[in-house]
Amino acid sequence: MNQLNSETVRWIKSKPLFLVALLVLVAGLVGWLLQGGQTQQTATQWPAPLAQLKPDFEVTQPLPAQLKLDGDKVALGARLFSDVRLSLDDTISCASCHVLSAGGTDNRYRSVGVNGGVGSVNAPTVLNSGFNFVQFWDGRAASLEAQVEGPVNHPKEMAANWPLVLSKLGKDAAYAAAFSKLYADGITATNIKDVIATFERSLITPNSRFDKFLQGNAAALTAPEKHGYELFQTYGCASCHQGVNLGGNMFEKMGLMGDYFADRGNVTEADNGRFNVNHNPESLHEFRVPSLRNVALTAPYFHDGNAATLEEAIAVMAKYQLGRAMPAKDLNDIAAFLRSLTGELAGQPL
């Protein structure tokens, strides 16, 4: 991984060492316990003075500038991502609910599909989704390829099926030529899923101001943003939101320190979360922790879209995940830090 640059290390060193050490140890222990004693990331090398601590999760690190992907697959996947012929009535594409210029979501409480069908959860961002350890809020898809399967067949999303999709795309000479160039068997459901997933893996958003800070530019963040990052760690947010994607690498129960669903009301089957997949009572109300990359652009928040603003989402997390009220200044500084996580897509600021 990329080590933190010397300027950032000096900023960390300016904080009391005992506090830094304590925070890292507590965050590591909490993250370990919440994952059932199993880590999903390996220990890594930290800069002094943290190297000797060897925490069980990777330090937050900048996104890579690019990944090594097949350019032809990326280009073909991009075309299909915006192709409405993947839907029953040629009205909905992947891009309908995952608007790349809007943070990879549609900024709706619920997405609307074919014939006005309304989904049961808030659409998660597609940006940086290749770094998630599973896909969907409930983690029912183990890969991006498996994720592509869901919307195509879902009656409230694209409401199609693969024979129909293959029939429509097979009549497109340009698609036929492009697939034949890449695959001996041409246009198949498996190959469509492969190119779309490859395109989705290319949707990384590096060069946020926070990335630049991690790379050594201590001036990339303002004083409130630096304080917000410090609070993000001291409050324990980093126990779940860490790694290169600041999330996306574990499940967590919604409402650790309070009954979120009883207070919100109108509980639905989708609120069961991971339980709907594995039917394990211990997984009730567990969801994949979302990435915080570009989070300022992806309102409304949570699987239910119930928080309209970033500040509201932070307050909800403080109450139901941490069991405490957060002073307004702390909340605002954490929000300022989170807004520094907005990056670039294909070299253009989001």
Which residues fall in each region the model found?
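Post-cleavage N-terminal segment of exported redox proteins
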Residues: 2-74, 132, 150-226, 230, ...
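Short glycine/threonine-rich turn/loop motifs
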Residues: 39-150, 211-316, 322-324, 349-350
